[in-house]
Amino acid sequence: MRVPLSWLQDLVQLNETVEILAEGLSMAGFEVEAIDDLASHAQGVVVGLVKDHQPHPNADKLSVCQVDVGSGEGLQIVCGAPNVRIGIHVPVAMVGATLPAVGIKIKASELRGVPSQGMICSLAELGLESNGNGIAILEEIAENVPDLGQPVGPLLGLDDTVLELAITANRPDGMSMVGIAREVAALTGASLQLPQLDMAPIHKSFEPDSTSSASMLKGGLYGLTALENVDGELTSPAWLKQRLERSGCKSVNGVVDITNLVMLEQGQPLHAFDIDALEMITGQTVSAESFGLRQARNNELFNGLDGHQLQLNENCQIVTCHDIPIALAGVMGSAESGVSAKTRRVWLESAMFTPTAVRTTCRAVGLRTDASSRFEKGLPVEMTLASARRAVTLMEEHLGIKSNGCWVYGESPKSAEPVKLRREAIHRLLGPIGVENDNRYLEDDIIETSLLALGCELSPYNEGWLVIVPPSRRRDLSREVDLIEEVSRLVGFDRFEANLPDPLEPGGLTTAQTAERLLRQMLCGAGLQEVTTLSLVGADSDEPQRIAISNPLLAETSHLRTNLWEEHLRICQRNLQSSQPGCWLYEIGNVYTVTDELINQRAVLGGVICAERSFERWSTSGKIKSMTYHQARGQLSQVFQGLKLDINDRPLKDNHSLHPGRSAELFVEGKLLGDFGQLHPALSERLDLPEATYLFALDLQCIIQAATRSNRWNPTFRPFPTVPAMELDLAVIVSKECSCSDLIQAIRKAGKPLLEHVELIDRFEGGQLDPYSCSQAFRLRYRSKDRTLSEDKVNPIHEKVRQALVKQFSAELRS
């Protein structure tokens, strides 16, 4: 945002130097990226009169001019401009002058054998917009030309200073001169002299078609003002052109210049359509009801005002007239409908478009404009009609244009709700300020002065104030903490004291934090790498329950995520496309769901085990050996064993992202922990991922609670065994529906008190087994506390285990 100080001075009284003003704005959040002193562009450039003009003896395209600069002695200057002639006043750069716009220092030189003592300048060489290729002729720029030898800077508007500000996304009010003026007034206490606006101009209603109606209501408001007695050939007054040029806008014609001026002044983009051009394009009479707002069709063509033809798609929102595209909504108008020298009637559009729609359109066509940069940040709907009325007033005053009515479709802006601002909350969050070696809390009058400077309305109550923020000024002040931040910003962050806890106490990790760190170590030890992904995702028609955020910067980051695995699979895709053999990763992060209209935030451990982990394949004779379900599940078992957790697996039936026959619900202490399983074949095919891709999503809080039980977490002494153990294998044929965890649980129960450990060592399907059965083999370790076991002591218990499996699971014994 370019802020000319001469324009700012007309809106607010400036008593500070440029440097102090720039520092104050930067400290308040409007970073000043550069200070452009326009006078430096014309330092050493004076008014000259061409007294003589002769062809160069040694060059066809050069001429030798005798120029009078009021010093008594004429200057001989070699010039290459085609429009130089006798009797014109021109800007002359004297020897020693520097032209920053082109990086030239003027020296006395000799061009093709002819001495030259200066340079006759074009507007471009002085850093100004120029429509021609020749030198600047001062008679064509101003009616009254200064005396010879006088500085040319004031005549060309090069007597100003421009601040270049970086405006953040949360401060759209900073994209207007009025917004910056209010900020300066709030910081310095200076008085404002703002243009008077009609905040509720008289208007009529119109009814668009149903599709346009929904889109216009989503934006908030769509207004059209009919203008007559327009002369498209009229140019803007010199002061208006200078303001636009200093602000970085090019002058086009009177109508367009005033719409741009109002955009820079008030922050509300406007657009003018030539009514006669619209009727020629559509072949029909154009009224307010003729306008529409819809999504573009794929491959629909659009000719922009910048001269480029764009191929649109369904992501682009367009303004139409009788369903023919005439503008990219909030971005740019069409070349066919723009104001030209032949324009006599105009529809002035003043509308609100949603930031998401404008941002999506810009990304779809690869184009950003001054208008779109404002719509993307979000604008107050209260200023839409007021800005249009401001533009009409300027056109009536300077161009003789007449208004023939205003038509509006949309809902009336709602009145602002008061925000409670508690005195205690201010003191608690900000702390005391240092005043003459004495720390004290902010006094009420300082707080009230800061809020009144923002234009707020205050109503005191026993705990503080009820604050109403005018929506036309600031849309980001909707909470108590927002107001507290504004108070601290205006008072000065550097004035608040640093308050440390007294006394300072040593820090430390809680048991839960220590357990989480141990969990991360175990996961890394199992070969998984930790990642961190963004918690914001795009909308998904398959997941309508995703929570939308109120003011997204991008359509791709407009909602809160409901799971971790979607982004994890994208990471796997990128790694495999980069020739990585596999991708094993995990993340501890939050997911967000809605229950009974309440937003729930839940910490989740999620991860992916995808394909191989290492490059070398010597152990498999160079062949790719896909990881099986049980091998992948075993990697997770290592982690749980490190936390001393016993996990039970049960068949999973209702997760459409996982393979229906190779997935399980995991339970710890009888509580559901989460899901583990192979990626569904349809998903793996669509995402071009290998079949051997396994996902897990587990409740972090459940893991931490189970791992930190005192019987697991607190270390206990257990002596090393002093007697040998006896190991026996047990193989049974059971139904495929029978889970390993159920079998192990039954074995442990039946094997007491001598059974020390049991583990699955083999699982087999196929061969001579029927298609509904499988063989599972377990290794059981028996040990007594005080003596060596003999077979006659172990066999009865082992037989008890065998019979328990036969009775509970109809198992067929194989060993």
Swiss-Prot record:
CDD domains xref list: PheRS_beta_core (cd00769), tRNA_bind_bactPheRS (cd02796)
Organism: Prochlorococcus marinus (strain MIT 9313)
One of the GO BP terms on file: phenylalanyl-tRNA aminoacylation
Protein name, entry field: Phenylalanine--tRNA ligase beta subunit
Stretches assigned to the B5 domain: 414-498
Cofactor: Mg(2+)
NCBIfam families: pheT_bact, YtpR
Gene3D superfamilies: 3.30.56.10, Bira Bifunctional Protein, Domain 2 (3.30.930.10), Ferrodoxin-fold anticodon-binding domain (3.30.70.380), Nucleic acid-binding proteins (2.40.50.140), Phenylalanyl-trna Synthetase, Chain B, domain 3 (3.50.40.10)
EC number annotated for this UniProt entry: 6.1.1.20
InterPro entries tied to this protein: aa-tRNA-synth_II/BPL/LPL, B3/B4_tRNA-bd, DNA-bd_dom_put_sf, Fdx_antiC-bd, Fdx_antiC-bd_sf, NA-bd_OB-fold, Phe-tRNA-ligase_IIc_bsu, Phe-tRNA-ligase_IIc_bsu_bact
